[in-house]
């Protein structure tokens, strides 16, 4: 059962059509016999700037607009969008005709394939590389059979010349773009070439030949713009369909019979997986004329009511017994009059046309039948334009010139029920990566985090929801399609199979390991200015603070002592930056021992176990390959005493790498699994906050992977991590976390259903200001799946297979 708020009443009956002449009479009214295909196309000139002279004194422009999330929005947000759309419609006065065009057409899949294309590199990774490439192609094929959905608004005005029309059209265009901006809708005006391409694609729906045109060719060849877009032929022999080139088509109009419609009606039509053009022609009626018309109808109804009452009296019946239609129409007319006079409503004349096209008559009839079925679902009918197929086809072109004389009178609210927004898509070019399929449209999601204001990201989900798997899939995609470096902090030892398979370096950090990383490592690009030691000092202070277990931080005297020692410790390296001159923790310890202050001795004593004692794993020169493109710091075996220290040192190593890569103009991706472990300690949490603040400027892209959003809201400082993340990949969420996310990201209850008891690999993607539900069912038979899975039984099977 439809919710009351999702439906808007329509007025019908005697107001349904202003006129509909006889079809055959209309066919005979053609003023001239078109001898060529070009003369059938109803415009005179198309300018480079997108201004089209449609008729002698009629000029038009077109704006393309994109989708926003309407169907998945909260009811409150839906109402806001609907009211803004009503205001949008009310902007148009009676001097402006406008046409909304919604075009579903088969796309050139080669353009999409270019975005997901992964070329073989003829190296040892080609087997998994091409396996991943094939998976992407299969996922692309699942999305809407290669259909592209585009949306346009075309507006036209009458003017004596293009000189007079141009400034007015540009002013209207600016207002339309601003009105779209209020709605949060991206839009841009089309130039002449883009407008011609739309018409070319409408005339050649079943052809693969691309549109080739330039205005320079017109000057060279003496041809007209119509020569470049026209099909080989038009045949309007039948009254119910037509032939254009190798395509057969039919145009129908929507006969609105329902007393009320839902805001889902247009979305249902646009969800069809067939070629379809929906055109809604709208003409505003002058307000005074509209009120005068309604008052005239009310007068006519009152006169008819009086006549019926007289008949009733003469026949001996109660004069209150009159035909029910009269009472209905009378009440309806008075309500419309009230809306026009006091509720900011206008009256519009609208024509809704549907252009179906196919290769064969059978396919066409099937498409028309499917379209008619959707209309019937909403208590409307889809009627063929008998003997007006040519007018219907030409009215479907985005020229804002309606040649079909069948119109329906609707108020603003009733017109706005054809909400042109459904759900957003995300398919970007550039270094875009695969994030699953849109759960609503089934279209592929390809997004480039580098294009976000803040590319920082979070992957959130309950255990078993697919967090680590999603992170590994992104890493794999990054490895195959970019030159970015990838660094992983792995507290659970889950990533090494994938890292080793991709030729990466796994660094096992533990008290018994022979892999060493030096916390004193520094490079000359460590800071923005020429003083790398200044920023390194912050890290050393955090390190010592953690070692000393100072809950309230170190005393100022202790910080001063360390700050005094650091230039002495690094002097040899800064004078001669050779690897063998890099200091180690023991050098800092020795320097502190030489200081006279008791604070220095206290710090040195705290450092002693990490320099000469059982925890001296971090008192060595780095002996592992840190210039590998893919590095995983496996800290699973670090004991409780070293775990926090190890995670802080790993973060500093990442910062070292980021600073080196910045000079090389290279991005660095940093993945932190079990991110909540870092947020529990003040020092590592503070360092993480700094990473989220500073990384973007240095070309770093950090991603935190954790279970609970609550950990990210533990303090105002840590909350900055959440606020500075424009990419959030949400898998299944616990109840408490769902409510927090809904509040923080303005997620609707319907959207929340995608992270409520959802299957593995399903959830919501927050990208900038866009929220898209996704699903990602990864083929378990692929070799890559065995490298990426975290399920113990599947890992065991993979190892057995590998050892066999």
Q: Across the structure, where does each feature detected by a protein language model lie?
A:
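P-loop NTPase motor domains
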Residues: 68, 75-94, 101, 105, ...
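Hydrophobic positions on the alpha1 helix immediately C-terminal to the Walker A/P-loop
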Residues: 470
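Extended, folded cores of ATP/NTP-driven motor/assembly subunits in large transport
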Residues: 2-421
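A short helix-turn-beta junction within AAA+ P-loop NTPase domains corresponding to the substrate/partner-engaging
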Residues: 503-507, 717-730
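Hydrophobic anchor at the beta1->P-loop junction of P-loop NTPases
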Residues: 459
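Conserved lysine of the Walker
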Residues: 467
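Post-Walker A helix-loop "phosphate-sensing" segment adjacent to the P-loop in P-loop NTPases
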Residues: 477-487
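Conserved P-loop NTPase
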Residues: 745-801
